Amino acid sequence: MGKFTVTLLVFLMVLPLIVLPARDEEHDEKDKRSAAQAIPRYSSKPGESLIDLMARNQKSSGNEACQDSDCDKDCGDCFCGYFKPTCSCHCLDMIPL
């Protein structure tokens, strides 16, 4: 290979390191904080089932808690959808745990 080709290859390999600005740690921390605030985090209490945790989170988000009487008789227990704005009923054996 000629001198020009080698120089061009080296330049193209080094160019992204020069052009791309380095992200500082303060900027990364700011991104992590804003991401953590955007996603609500809920922790379960000792001995609390997943269904109870989701129902409690649904109540704490301002949505009305679902009632078993709202459920279809064939469906079974009421289950508050974690990512849904309203409560809905699901068959408990269909919920992947």
Curated annotation (Swiss-Prot):
Expressed by the venom duct. It is found in: Secreted. Keywords: Disulfide bond, Secreted, Signal, Toxin. It comes from the Eukaryota. Contains 4 disulfide bonds. Residues 22-59 form a propeptide. GO terms for cellular component: extracellular region. The keyword Repeat does not apply. The keyword Disulfide bond applies. One of its GO terms (molecular function) is toxin activity. Residues 1-21 form the signal peptide. The cysteine framework is XXII (C-C-C-C-C-C-C-C). Belongs to the teretoxin J (TJ) superfamily. This is Teretoxin Tan22.5.
